[in-house]
């Protein structure tokens, strides 16, 4: 009788490479690597998995699906965990889990393995998502079970013919996709240490950024960015292009001490140039086009959605319901913003929309004013009536 098939979420790094060598004793390991826009050498990763002992190796290009079905709902909801973090890693985990489950069904695998440790958020995100999609699948986490130190991993790797990554002495732990780059560990673990320039990978230092501002126009249709400077492109290409444009101006650097799902605080360095520009630009079109009641209520749901995504509940009915509400609000979010990029700052300096609720004739203080100021007297009387009655009844 043959071995059981196992799907491994494979990154090409030391942890998951060692996992192949360890797991192949008991399983037929099928390595699956998802391209979410991190810019890795995917051909090398594919071949490396086979060299170590995987029976099959797959590279899945999911950039477009990731952008359309995971990043876009987060953008439209201005999803920022603790009002600071655009959920870079948290957004990619659900689609990775989804593809792992699909590959398990396609290949007849009964088990899924991931390379997360026992103290991070991602173990929860993967396992909760997999359970939501197929509760019958078994999930194992070799790195969490081993509790090995890096030196022990290296010893095992050398003894079992696992190639040692060239950047193994890099003190940082980095995760990247098209929505941004996350960095932790090393000197960053002390929150008093300023992040050194070497900790950044996709943004220039604002001090070294160009001395001249750059202006770009971003066009939205139904809340989705569709063009930069009138050049239409797919959402994934637009985000990747904007990462380069805004990154060279030092935009999107975030230094955040966050509350992890597992109960500890963690200091993270994020680089999210495209995300920060798009979030600012999208909000400005909403400010033009949404009625006041939606503008005031939507942020409440945005905060809740940010927490749900961060806390591993992408496939929760609550998440689905909030995303549906947000999608309904986006029907009128059409227009163009002009964004000034300059030394770490992305400032929206102009905006227009065919659905704009801004009426210059109502807002102006010039002779063109069409606002009926005489109506203010009755409005104030009725608006303030509850306050007036309360004051009369409860004097002092």
Curated annotation (Swiss-Prot):
List the molecular function annotations (GO) for this entry: argininosuccinate synthase activity; ATP binding
Q: Which InterPro entries does the protein's record reference?
A: Arginosuc_syn_C, Arginosuc_syn_N, Arginosuc_synth, Arginosuc_synth_CS, Arginosuc_synth_type_1_subfam, AS_cat/multimer_dom_body, Rossmann-like_a/b/a_fold
Fetch the CDD domains from UniProt.
Answer: ASS
For this UniProt record, give its keywords in alphabetical order, as a comma-separated list. Amino-acid biosynthesis, Arginine biosynthesis, ATP-binding, Cytoplasm, Ligase, Nucleotide-binding
- Give the residues the record marks as binding L-aspartate: 117, 121-122
Q: In which pathway does it act?
A: Amino-acid biosynthesis; L-arginine biosynthesis; L-arginine from L-ornithine and carbamoyl phosphate: step 2/3
A GO cellular-component term linked to this record: cytoplasm
Which residues bind ATP per the record?
Answer: 9-17, 115
Does the keyword Cytoplasm belong to this entry?
A: yes
So where does L-citrulline get bound? 85, 121, 125, 173, 258, 270
Gene Ontology biological process terms, A to Z: argininosuccinate metabolic process; L-arginine biosynthetic process; urea cycle
Task: Name the reaction it catalyses.
Answer: L-citrulline + L-aspartate + ATP = 2-(N(omega)-L-arginino)succinate + AMP + diphosphate + H(+)
Q: Which SUPFAM superfamilies match?
A: Adenine nucleotide alpha hydrolases-like, Argininosuccinate synthetase, C-terminal domain
Give one Pfam family. Answer: Arginosuc_synth
- Could you tell me where this protein is found in the cell? Cytoplasm
Q: Does the keyword Nucleotide-binding apply?
A: yes
Group of enzyme by EC = ligase
Q: What is its EC number?
A: 6.3.4.5
What family does the database annotate? Belongs to the argininosuccinate synthase family. Type 1 subfamily.
Q: How does it assemble?
A: Homotetramer.
Recorded protein name is: Argininosuccinate synthase
Q: Whose protein is this, by species?
A: Streptococcus agalactiae serotype Ia (strain ATCC 27591 / A909 / CDC SS700)
